[in-house]
Amino acid sequence: MEKSKKDGHQAVLNEGEENELEVFGYHTQNLRRALCLVTAILTLGAVQLMFYWRPEWWVWTSCIPCPLQEADTILLRTTDEFRRYMRKKVFCLHLSTLKFPISKNPEEPLVADHHSVINQAVMKPELKLRCIQVQKIRYVWDFLKKRFQKVGLLEDSNSCFDIHHTFGLGLTNEEQEVRRLVCGPNSIEVEIQPIWKLLVKQVLNPFYVFQAFTLTLWLSQGYIEYSVAIIILTVISIVLSVYDLRQQSVKLHKLVEEHNKVQVTITVRDKGLQELESRLLVPGDILILPGKISLPCDAILIDGSCVVNEGMLTGESIPVTKTPLPQTENTMPWKSHSLEDYRKHVLFCGTEVIQVKPSAQGLVRAVVLQTGYNTAKGDLVRSILYPRPLNFKLYNDAFKFMVFLACVGVVGFFYALGVYMYHEVPPRETATMALILLSATVPPVLPAALTIGNVYAQKRLKKEKIFCISPQRINMCGQINLVCFDKTGTLTEDGLDLWGTVPTAGNCFQAVHSFASGEAVPWGPLCAAMTSCHSLILLDGTIQGDPLDLKMFEGTGWNMEDSQVASCKFGMADSSTVIKPGPKASQSPVDSITILRQFPFSSGLQRMSVIAQLAGDLHLHVYMKGAPEMVARFCRSETVPKNFSQELRNYTVQGFRVIALAHKTLKMERLSDMDHLAREKVESELAFLGLLIMENRLKKETRPVLKELSEARIRTVMVTGDNLQTAITVAKNSEMIPVGSQVVIVEANEPGDLVPASVTWQLVGTQEPGSGKKDTYIDIGNSSVPAGKGYHFAMSGKSYQVLFHHFYSMLPQILVNGTIFARMSPGQKSSLVEEFQKLNYYVGMCGDGANDCGALKMAHAGISLSEQEASVASPFTSKTANIECVPHLIREGRAALVSSFGVFKYLTMYGIIQFIGTSLLYWQLQLFGNYQYLLQDVAITLMVSLTMSINHAYPKLAPYRPAGQLLSPQLLLSVFMNSCFTCIVQVCTFLTVKQQPWYCEVYKYSECFLVNQSNLSANVSLDRNWTGNATLVPASVLSFEGTTLWPIVTFNCISAAFIFSKGKPFRKPIYANYLFSLLLASAAGLTIFILFCDFQDLYRKMEFIPTPTSWRVSILIAAFVQFCVAFFVEDAVLQNRELWLFIKKEFGFYSKSQYRILQRKLAEDSTWPPVNRTDYAVNGKNGFYVNRAYESPEEVPKGKLKLEEQASEQHFWTRL
């Protein structure tokens, strides 16, 4: 590996990102390529088909390794556990095709931006660039860094100064043309794939290829009816798949196409404004925002402000205010300057600009940041086009099981070869019969049968108003054992109700103003803050914005209006929002308040602020609102009441949503200076005004659903952006934290100059004050959780980040009992879900889609309660806006999983049953007849496979999950035991029939019916070596062995279908599946009828020989005994949960899931959980474990962390 990197053969693409790839350079050799083509022709395309399935084989055989710089073929490999390969051709872009001269001087940059990779990728004097296109993204070879670099975006290394001054005046026409050629068009084009191409992709699926081989073989042997039935079913399946793919392609194409043809206005350097089609935009262009527009690219706002609807990307329909990137002189990268809050300056592609507010310069301008598939919308579309593969053990086990069945078939193949060669049968017939036995073990109906269960489950979910865009995830829902819930809008109501305000005066809280009286807030600084500190906008005469802001504003009784020319003392025009008292407002000495500038709220900063002017006032005023703990940090300490923490806790423990407000006077000489003020300067030295108290009620469905999940032993976790105390109270009120359980708050702090990173454990106690309501406090006295009581960890996003950075080895131990995660940013939510997955939890995530898109996408089953377009990144969407959808989905997932296992076991047994019967007949060169196969394959197996999964989910969630592994001992024993039973019965009847006095090897058909069956042995005297003539049934089919084995095999198939159709506790009983029950009863009745009837035409058609009635009764008894034994073993032994738990306990078998191992370990640790103490990281500032890949709460790496490597050897603590 290291050698490959040193010689330039290997590099990494998108290093540290979710879509990280390893790239290898190869050079095509014509001789090797010619040999591959000749081999493909000689093998009739078989080798070419293998190359299609495994592109790396084609590269390894037709190319030789070489440095990437010289390669014409690139082999890419994902760095995840799947290690998938892709092959890409290197192509060149020639700048000489441009219509203006290009300098060939290596010292002269091609574009003005000295950070641009374009300057480092151009080969001079050839004037060409080497490129590859991977999943819609173009990469160019960087000769300086010796790796492929992404184009179509501005480099992150640009500073705020670079953005404003390098690109502030626009690009020249020449630079636009260069960037246009290199970066490609600014369009997100989803090709509507031709039907023939979709068909080819479906048909070339490995299983369909094997199926085609099998059906060709069967058709060549005259087995037409069943082959035609399978062909029809396969064609229907392929057509439906192609239709679905085509519809999705058309829908996605229509969704993105309209954004490719937007007319926009840009600024061209030295030429002024110019109109052009949006597909011609390039990174660095200056985009003019005239008003309402659908953004065709990602852009950084540099002048003015605007309000956008980001619902398409975030699922949040609340308008978001964007502010310009500050003009600073430092060289810090612009994203680092704005920390995780850089998104407040970025306008994302696909979002709608609904209002613009020009600055003093008169225009709202933005620099194009990313184009095409590099944009936020492009990334969303790519996530749909190239979804992350499912790492579900069921599918891996299914593949292994198929390989095992194929191996059994190979054994049968050589067995058939040996038998037929021993009897000197012609080679062609020998090969054909051997191939027939090979194909018998893998049922061709298997893929359709496994798919049909998900189709039924999908339809049942649709009736519950749960929509699914990823049906293969339904089975995964059956394994969910942990569900993360957002709080606001998910567990609690969307809307907030005003409860009251708690103003301050003279460093003390004053009397509460209650909104229950119906009176508006009395005039004062607190009222002024409530009227102005919000992100509300007036759109078409309607006030729109965040529900919290709306409720707060309604409580003041003031009205809003837009003023395009707002007068102020500075005498400058500006587009501003003006607030005036309404008829319900308290009496005020102020006629109006003008909002001049806004610093928007973000989940990372947990605050917002505005600069406003009161009518008649000579000064400007700053108002701030946000999380109380955050706002208090920016206030002068003498203005914050001494009992601030206690007062805040009094309300948060009751489940109230608490917002703090603050204010200061801003002295300025010129209004133009306001636009250049840094947020840090504005938000400092404020005076604390008071608290706004709002109620956030639980939804009525929350408590019953959480109780149902708890009884089913499914862990529930709250992941919210709200206050920690509020989250704890909601968790207790909803009984997410059961009555009697203890809560331990985990508070972690970053390392200081002399103090290492630390983590403090505080036990939250509960007491009953005199008022009768429960209060929550920090219990300092206790040093451990009381024995016998459960405990739950609660922490904030800040603490989670510190733990992730400095105490990563301890994080899994906390997560095993972590229940409340508050003040979590979107990136932290995604990271938390991933960390739970590393502990082998199957994680469900339920949220309203606002800040949960990443977590919904990361979870095994993301359930969005939002109907916005962003939910396309979530596998499931519920139109019912409460969490009742979660148990519905889990129930259907469990039922679908059990159905899949049942169908898989049945079809496996069906293959083995037929394999054993056919092998026995092969011993004497015989075979079942076509109609015998047809009845088993079509009337029984095919219909069973299509109806077994119709069974509905059981209405109550069981307190345990269904088996999730096909290779589990129970399932393997089930298949093995049933195989043994059917083998014993078939072999015994096969040998016993030979011992009957009336037995002979071959009979003349008509004579069998002329004799008295009860006296058959006395009346029939035929030569055992008689071979019949052309008018008789072929000797290879007509035999007593075949006539005996066929009903045994058929009854075995019916028995297996009944035994494996498991009902309670995950599905309704078998009799509730009316169609399936009727089918089994009909199949059993038909088989008995054929067994005992004496219709000559029927026997001739079925190719049977009549046998004595006593023998037929013996066959029925043998089949019934086999059914009883198999049913008893399956139901009383293999499916006996208590018995298996006892066996596991006696033999010391325990779950190998990481969370189970940790639970057992912690249960034996008397010092866990630590309470009322502080632990420090021993090796100073970096703690005992540092994850270097973790950069920020918004950019948490995916799948790059390894839990086991350092967890054991670096677990050192010091205690305070």
UniProtKB/Swiss-Prot annotation:
This is Probable cation-transporting ATPase 13A5. One of its GO terms (molecular function) is metal ion binding. Mg(2+) binds at residues 848, 852. The keyword Transmembrane helix applies. Keywords: ATP-binding, Glycoprotein, Magnesium, Membrane, Metal-binding, Nucleotide-binding, Translocase, Transmembrane, Transmembrane helix. Glycans are attached at residues 650, 817. Specifically expressed in brain and stomach. It is a multi-pass membrane protein. It is an enzyme of class 7 (translocase). GO terms for cellular component: membrane. Its EC number is 7.2.2.-. It catalyses: ATP + H2O = ADP + phosphate + H(+). The active site is at residue 486. Belongs to the cation transport ATPase (P-type) (TC 3.A.3) family. Type V subfamily. It comes from the Eukaryota. Gene3D superfamilies: Calcium-transporting ATPase, cytoplasmic domain N (3.40.1110.10), Calcium-transporting ATPase, cytoplasmic transduction domain A (2.70.150.10), Calcium-transporting ATPase, transmembrane domain (1.20.1110.10), HAD superfamily/HAD-like (3.40.50.1000). The chain crosses the membrane at residues 33-53, 198-218, 222-242, 401-421, 433-453, 896-916, 933-950, 971-991, 1040-1060, 1075-1095, 1113-1133. The keyword Transport does not apply. InterPro entries: ATPase_P-typ_cation-transptr_N, ATPase_P-typ_cyto_dom_N, ATPase_P-typ_P_site, ATPase_P-typ_TM_dom_sf, ATPase_P-typ_transduc_dom_A_sf, HAD-like_sf, HAD_sf, P-type_TPase_V. It holds the Pfam family Cation_ATPase_N. It is found in: Membrane. It comes from Mus musculus.
